[in-house]
Each structure stands twice: as structure tokens, then as C-alpha cells.
Amino acid sequence: MKPVIALVGRPNVGKSTLFNRLTKSRDAIVADFAGLTRDRHYGNGKLGKHEYIVIDTGGFEPDASSGIYREMAKQTQQAVAEADVVIFVVDARAGLSAQDHDIANYLRRLGKPCLLVGNKAEGMREGVQLAEFYELGLGEVLPVSAAHGQGVRSMLESALDTLQLPEPEDEPEDGEDKPIRLAVAGRPNVGKSTLINTWLGEERLVAFDMPGTTRDAISVPFERNGQQFELIDTAGLRRKGKVFEAIEKFSVVKTLQAIESANVVLLLLDATQGVTDQDAHIAGYILESGRAVVLAVNKWDAVDDYGRQMLERSIETRLSFLKFASLHFISAKKRQGLGPLWTSIAQAHKAATCKMPTPVLTRLLLEAVQFQAPKRSGMFRPKMRYAHQGGMNPPVIVIHGNSLEHVTDAYKRFLEGRFRKEFDLVGTPLRIEMKTSRNPFAEDSDA
């Protein structure tokens, strides 16, 4: 088991910057706004042979009583409960605060291994300027600069040393049991976090009744029927033209990255709002990224029969380019219709990673041509010879022959239908590439 390290501290002391150092990523949003990270955010890191998990948390105020700050405090308490060691981050430049005392008192009561870290300590005389933090009663203050990387390795070594870890065994090579990365995507406030929380049985993501509450792409380990998943809530997308704060712009980028890194994307729509332009744009990006996709309409219980008919018609017309995807009608809050989603998710992943033998593809191609040959274009009639698989996730079929640049889009769709039916490719895009054989005499004739 990888040891778990939780980063705890009041808002804006640099926990997310330190998280990025420890995970060598920019997975956590970093900006100069207090209260930016509001959920537990998991990342992987490695020091020598030792791998570890880091949890980044929202700014912790143990006695927070108002709205979303109370939710952030609860998330942080759960992160501390999950951790093997806690790194309590304070702001060396701002000095000791009453909040720091409150957090220290809370951590001391838990009796869990804890390191006190003074961040933003670059250029400081640690003996003098960090002395006040000894009042917290947590022992030595480790000076670091997360922004510049100073002292971070020494701090990490100290954290891992407290756990007295055995030497790790060599891990087996990657196999087919790797987790399926599932991105839950959609506009703000369509119920993405509510759906994941329902699946997990705990309030893992802050699900607050206001658009844009989840501002980061949060990854959560999860198991279903023996299959490992990584669930990603993708920080509800908004139209780029309406994004004003730097924080929201960064979240849009993280959402697009999460979609691209996923194996399967669950696109969540809001039954009470219909299919919006932004829904169509997100769907288009998923298709462009080549991700397997499942469509789910949330809040289905909140619309009447007429509204449902109009919504189904809207999906057929506005999202016609995703007609290969399974469609589900659910209520995340009432736990209605959630079971069949997993069947479609597994089916979409299986289709996206399907292996298609060259002899079978070639047979299907030649049978299709015999049934309906491609149309002649002027002097040229496309001649198709054989096909092979060119990639997975999404599946790519490469067709070889002559004059294939003249094959129409309509004929490509005809071929796509034949291939989809044979291999049961439900829930995944299918790309067909035409590769025209070069005429060896063409260049000589130009000489």
C-alpha cells in the first residue's frame, strides 16, 4: 500500500503549489485566491523507490460555520482521517495566526504523525523568523519554498521517515487490470458531483447548490464489480466567452485535459434545461478527442411527459453526431436509473479497446464493396484492397487501395456501419482512414 500524505493548512498558504511539487504536475489549480481548493484532490508521487499518494485539501478552518467553508472543513477532516502522515503548512512570511493555533490544536488531538512546514521561507533567517511557530507545540519547523523547490525533498524524506516504510518490492509490469479512467463531464450544476457522491456513498466532492462549485478536476479511486475505476469530476465547463476569472479559465483547461486523458466520458445533461449550445460544444470536444462516451440525462424526474418528448427530439437532432452512444435517463439525487450506466460504461470501454484482426477487417471490406461499390469520380473509381487496425481508444481502421481520396463521406459512413455491427462498437467513435497506394511510375513520368 502506498503511504498517504495529507496537506493541511489555512487558505492561501501554498498547499496546492506544494502538491504540484510533490506530484511533479500541475494537477491542482494554483492562483493567488484564498479558498481555491475545496475538495480532496489526490495525486501520485515518487521519491527514489518509494511511491506515495498526496491529498491536497481546501483551506482548513476547524470551526467554520458558514456555507461552503463548513463543507471544506469537513473535506479536510476526512482527508486527515485517510492520511498516514499530515503535513501542516503555515505561511512563514505572514507569521503565526489564530487559525494556525486552531488547526494545531485539532491535529494534536488526533495523535497522527504530523510535520510542521513553514512555506514561502526563501531568503529568510529560519532561526529567527520561524521561531514563533514553535508555540504550536508540533516540534521543529521545516522551512521550504514550494514555489522554488527549496527544502521540499528534505521535507518529504522526513515525512516518509516517520512511517518507517519497508523497502518496496518490484512492481509487475502494466497489465490489462489498469483502472478505467472515467470522466464525468458537463456544464456547471448538472449534477456531476452529486452522481459521483451517490456512487461512492460519501460526500467526496463538494456538491453545493450553485453553478461552478467544483472548480478542479478531481480524481477518485473506485471499484465496481471487481473493476478498478478512477472517477473524474471535470469542473463543470462554461463557454469560454463567458469566463472572466482566471480560476474558471484554468478549470476549463483542466476539464479538456481530463476528457483527453479519460478512457470513457460520461456526458451529463440537465433535463430541466434541454440540450444547450454548450452541451453540444462539450459533446463535440469529446468526439474530437476520440473518447468513448455514454450520455446521461439527469433530473429526468423533474420534467413532465411533454418535456421528455421535446428533450428526446432535441438530443436526436443536436447530438446526432453521438448516435453511437448509449443514452440513459437518470436522477442522481433519487438514485434512479444508475445501475444500467455501468453496463454501458463497460461496453463503451470494451468497444474502444477492441482488437480487430486484419483478415476479418479485409473480409468485411470486400463484402461491403461487393454489396455496394464506391461511386466513380470522373475518370477515377476507388479500388479498395485490404484493411487493418491502426489504433485503439478510439479504434482506427486503415483501408488501403487506389484513388481512395475520391471516396465520399457517405460511403465512409456506410463502411462504418458494417464495421460497427460486426464488432459491436457501441459507445466509441470509429475513425476510418484511407491510404492510397503510391504509383511507382508517377514520379518517373514527371522527370
Curated annotation (Swiss-Prot):
GO biological process: ribosome biogenesis
Superkingdom: Bacteria
Keyword Iron: no
Binding residues for GTP 2: 186-193, 233-237, 298-301
Signal sequence, start to end: none
Keywords for this protein: GTP-binding, Nucleotide-binding, Repeat, Ribosome biogenesis
InterPro entries named among the record's database cross-references: G_ENGA (IPR031166), GTP-bd (IPR006073), GTPase_Der (IPR016484), KH_dom-like (IPR032859), KH_dom-like_a/b (IPR015946), P-loop_NTPase (IPR027417), Small_GTP-bd (IPR005225)
Record's keyword annotation contains GTP-binding: yes
GO molecular function: GTP binding; ribosome binding
CDD domains reported in the protein's UniProt record: EngA1, EngA2
Domain EngA-type G intervals: 3-167, 180-353
Binding site for GTP 1: 9-16, 56-60, 119-122
Pfam assignment, any one: KH_dom-like
PROSITE patterns according to UniProt: G_ENGA (PS51712)
Gene3D superfamilies: 3.30.300.20, P-loop containing nucleotide triphosphate hydrolases (3.40.50.300)
Residue ranges of domain KH-like in the record: 353-438
NCBIfam families: GTPase_EngA, small_GTP
Family in the record: Belongs to the TRAFAC class TrmE-Era-EngA-EngB-Septin-like GTPase superfamily. EngA (Der) GTPase family.
Subunit field text: Associates with the 50S ribosomal subunit.
Function: GTPase that plays an essential role in the late steps of ribosome biogenesis.
The protein's name: GTPase Der
